[in-house]
Amino acid sequence: MREEHLSLLVCSRCRGALRVSAVQERHSDRLIAGELACIKCDATYPIVGGVPRFVPRENYASGFGLEWTRHARTQYDNNSGIPASEQRFFGQTQWPRDLRGQLVLEVGSGSGRFTEQAAKTGATIVSFDYSYAVEANAASNGHRDNVLVVQADVFAMPFPTRSFDRIFCFGMLQHTPSPARAFAVLPIFLRPGGHLCVDIYKFTLWRTILQTKYWVRPLTRHMNPERLYSWVRRWVDFMWPLAGCIRRLPKGYALNWRLLVADYSFLGLKGDVLKEWAYLDTFDMLAPRFDRPATLRTVQKWASKSGLEDVSAEYTPHGVVLRARAGRGALLAD
């Protein structure tokens, strides 16, 4: 982390300001290893690998840490050969491509493929994840002067309230213990009139019944992540020839998903890249401790309860996408 980014952080316990209390390794203006301390209470937070850590490295989201460190660059556009991350980021947020002078918060960064897209706007990006996937993000984006990567908990975010011009949260809400509560804390960190964009898996009773991942998740979500990942690779390898045949059928890729083989051929992926995405997202289907989708109406209710304005919500291939702006609710809540 850059020392000048210290002002973007606060103590996650008491909200006090932080100071650098120890430095073990520094590269120019970047702190690689050291410690932050609260000036109000006795809390201290290690800096490991250039990332301030406000939660233990290992936690209920460790499966995501394994996933995104093993596949650190798999879904980056320059690796996949398709602009999937760019299109999703700007398509869902509908934000301008020039955000210089603005402060943007990314909630749930994973490996950082959307961090990269956000950073290209010129805004200052504060990106955090609950898992140690932050290490993959830091390796890919931590060198950027306008990026701060943090490991933190959405329910105890170490940032000043009402400080961000924009917040986005992709692919994360459904994997928290309470998506409604996680959503509710986001507007508190927006400046008046600030922009919010989130997505969450779509819930329908029929869709849930048909999605075979929910049949096996009661077993797989309790497995050791390393063991599950090994099983997933063997399963995808075993099924790959059959999946290739099924893929030739009309919408055969959808049947492959039901057979627990993530198939992104509809995006135009091929060969080794397609198979790498299959390893990644098959594991992603089965590993999360929590998988709690929501309906469009439910997400709209969350927004209304939070006092958000200019609310727009829609179903997309990625689930429910909501865009909104902070109103009086963001000013009053704290």
Mark where each language-model region is.
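SAM-dependent methyltransferase
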Residues: 226-288
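Conserved class I S-adenosyl-L-methionine
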Residues: 195-237
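Short catalytic micro-motifs in class I SAM-dependent methyltransferases
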Residues: 171-172
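Conserved N-terminal segment of class I S-adenosyl-L-methionine
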Residues: 1-158, 291-292, 298, 313-334
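Hydrophobic beta-strand segment of the Class I
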Residues: 167-168
